[in-house]
Amino acid sequence: MAFMEKPPAGKVLLDDTVPLTAAVEASQSLQSHTEYIIRVQRGISAENSWQIVRRYSDFDLLNNSLQITGLSLPLPPKKLIGNMDREFIAERQRGLQNYLNVIMANHVLSNCELLKKFLDPNNYSANYTEIALQQVSMFFRSEPKWEVVEPLKDIGWRIRKKYFLMKIKNQPKERLVLSWADLGPDKYLSDKDFQCLIKLLPSCVHPYIYRVTFATASESSALLIRAFNEKGTLKDLIYKAKPKDPFLKKYCNPKKTQGLELQQIKTYGRQILEALKFLHDKGFPYGHLHAANVMLDGNTCRLLDLENSLLGLPSFYRSYFTQFRKINTLESVDVHCFGHLLYEMTYGRPPDSVPVDSFPPASSLAVVAVLESTLSCEACKNGMPTVSRLLQMPLFSDVLLTTSEKPQFKIPTKLKEALRIAKECIEKRLTEEQKQIHQHRRLTRAQSHHGSEEERKRRKILARKKSKRSAVENSEEQPVKHSNSNNSAGSGASSPLTSPSSPTPPSTAGLSSALPPPPPPPPPPPPPAGPSPTSATEMPAPFLPQPVNGVNRGALLSSIQNFQKGTLRKAQTCDHSAPKIG
């Protein structure tokens, strides 16, 4: 079986869903304007970063381009006089940073081509509309029956996927949509298997999968034609949008959104799950479910864009499920994405963040139960249910589907094996990315905790306690060392001093074993009548501090016990205190 693990040599396949972060690091004032130096980073690796220089006019141009969204973005206002003042520049720099933060926090805006070109001009300088037109023109040379009516500009969210309204020359009233897409970072099929599978898509027949009229592929891209649907997608229904409008205008800040009725949620949800189950049973990887990839045909939902996984394109929700290590298969990705779709169908908008801590009131508790099983903290932490499990839940189990169309999609055994290996490679890249994000998050939390005010206070308290403890230990060691030195000098011992914690064993082994720990010494005898030239070993020395060494104490006690009064010499006293008379 032909199989390719790496993209073609010389071709860089970027994952456009990897978030970009931007930090305005500094500013530099030139003669007539100020430039802002911005550090841009792709993903979590600081090594994958670069600097760009932008003027305020560049930000203003970007902001004007984003007005199509209808969002009120916090771009700092213009200032003609005093705009070179140092304090003003610092304030504007903070404002521009906040502006970038707001844009990058928006899931739709952060993936749009306008922002990518602003932050990463080296990788997004190509005109993909022109590239797509060239590819389509080459296709028309061999297929002259098709004709382009007009380009459908930016109706999708993908940067490297373009759409054109088409017609057949001998059927001028029938409208079709041609989609052209470049390869993505998860393209692991060989060129031969890739082209065969793309051409196999028109043979896929299922009541809940949108039919492909024509499909072909080259070594670097794919081109598919489908019937144009005036009503648009399920997302168009929810957002009250026109299918031909640009993606940013339709979905970024809709004025009117409306959740669906309970019966619609049940029916559409069941239809989508049946389509997913069919693909899973066939071993065909999907991973691209979202409301704009579900065509609404009357009262029937049909999945779109089966070719995306063959092209290796990243999922719309990839930046969400890469945060959760338990969502590590394409089947679990489909279930998680279904949770996003169900949330939009229920509440008329996407969730503010994922995982969802608490769900707003819904038309049925059965809806909330499915949402909790796919979007809650517990579900994201422990893993997704299967599609079969969702079909058995009360929300969908009692839905009756009536269709006369028999599903069929015959995939040759050789291509099934190619799909299986490609699916494993896609899941492997996902798992590795999740692992890197998890490790980065742990490191970031540790650094944040280490640098927090509470942690700094705790470390100061511990340092003070340790310092006090060391001071107390040092003060206790000083008299012990002093007594050891005095004792060694008084007894004439030649052995070196030792610390109290590790006493040196005595030189005579029998003494330490024969003598138990001695009792306190008895009170000294009364002082003699006069001075005596006795040696120090024959006289008690009560003025010496009690030594802690067991050998010295034993010697002192033995000297006291063996003392004999008779060994003292008699002394004659001459009393000169009487008065002299003479």
UniProtKB/Swiss-Prot annotation:
Biased composition (Low complexity): 483-514
InterPro entries linked: Kinase-like_dom_sf, MONaKA_PX, Prot_kinase_dom, PX_dom, PX_dom_sf, SortingNexin/PXDomain-PKLike, WH2_dom
Pfam family, one: Pkinase
Subcellular location(s) of the protein: Cytoplasm; Cell membrane
Entry keyword Protein transport: no
Keyword line: Actin-binding, Cell membrane, Cytoplasm, Membrane
Protein name: PX domain-containing protein kinase-like protein
Annotated tissue distribution: Isoform 1 is present in all tissues examined. Isoform 2 is found in all tissues except skeletal muscle and very low levels in spleen. Both isoforms are widely expressed throughout the nervous system however levels of isoform 2 are higher in purified hippocampal and cortical neurons whereas glial cells express more isoform 1 than isoform 2.
Biased composition (Basic residues): 437-448, 457-469
Cytoplasm in keyword set: yes
PANTHER family with a match to the protein in the record: PX DOMAIN-CONTAINING PROTEIN KINASE-LIKE PROTEIN, PX SERINE/THREONINE KINASE PXK
Protein's GO biological process: inflammatory response; modulation of chemical synaptic transmission; negative regulation of ATP-dependent activity; negative regulation of monoatomic ion transport
Domain WH2: 548-567
Disulfide bond entries: none
Membrane topology classification: Peripheral membrane protein
